[in-house]
Amino acid sequence: MTVLEVALGQYGIKEIVGKKHNPEVLKYFHEMGHDWVKDDETAWCSAFINWCAMWADKPFSDKLNARSWLDVGTEVEIPDIGDVVILWRESPGSWKGHVGLFIREAGNYIYILGGNQNNQVCIKAYPKKQLLEYRKL
């Protein structure tokens, strides 16, 4: 099974608003050894891609920071569907980022399948100008 196939199998999993937390979101942390995470409000884009890569038997960062994926796999200029996409958040120099899987480019946007996108696993468009790298696992 590919990372993309694992991720697609989770499509639609979402956070629970309020005091309850979705055990499906928490498993992305717990099955990777991050048992200290107790709520689904903790940023989980990297946990999700780590979990998918683990189940696909591919390399993973094992870290919760999206930019940790800049050290996993091989950088590619032209991505294939399912390659890892790393974006910056706030500013290119910030430690903050987002990680997901490449679906397609259209105009000035990259469509990414990922976790914690609108608080769920879904495909969402991001501005191409926020791209840091594409990575092949």
Protein language model regions, located:
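...with weaker cross-activation on analogous glycine-rich loops/strands in unrelated enzymes
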Residues: 1, 58-122
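N-terminal capping segments
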Residues: 1-56
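A broad, low-specificity signal marking well-ordered, structured residues that form hydrophobic/aromatic
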Residues: 4, 110, 132
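Short amphipathic beta-strand/extended segments with alternating polar/hydrophobic composition
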Residues: 122-128
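Low-complexity, Gly/Ser/Thr/Pro-rich intrinsically disordered linker/tail segments
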Residues: 129-137
